[in-house]
Amino acid sequence: NIQPWKVYVASGALKDRIRDQMVAKVMQGVPFNSDYDYPETFDGEYRKRQVACAVELYGNMGIERGDKEGRARAHLRNFQMFDAPHVVFIGMDQAFGASVAIDVGMYMQTLMLSMTAHGVGCCPQGTMRYYPDIVREAFAIDGHINILLGISFGFEDPAVPANQTWIDREPIDKLVTF
């Protein structure tokens, strides 16, 4: 395999600078400018799963459905990297498409499984791709590298209500055809 992933790890002052710049953009209402399109909405079974995830997560955080301020604070926590001490950004060359992104996805899954096996908590975050220019500037990344996502990581705090969230998975017979 061609190992198409590009990996950038930020800790300390660098992570804080990236976090602060992202939070500032969110607070200023700067539109997201992801390198890749993401669906505005989901329909059918995907929407059902999205809503179930939100209900579970926000429920654990004590945020009611109509609490727009609470939801906004929870959304902002993404850009604050959930106070994790480190974040890894994953990118790939813009010339590559979905078939190569599959390799990158396998790398990301292996990275997260390895972190977990070593007692390190991690949270994959699509929101870390919303302001890719901040990441490119921080690491002096060429413009042809697109940022796919970030993974905040560190030792998990079990007292944080969001960390108690468990999202049910569909039964295998609903996802796999035999």
Locate each region found by the language model:
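Acidic, surface-exposed loops and disordered segments
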Residues: N1-F178
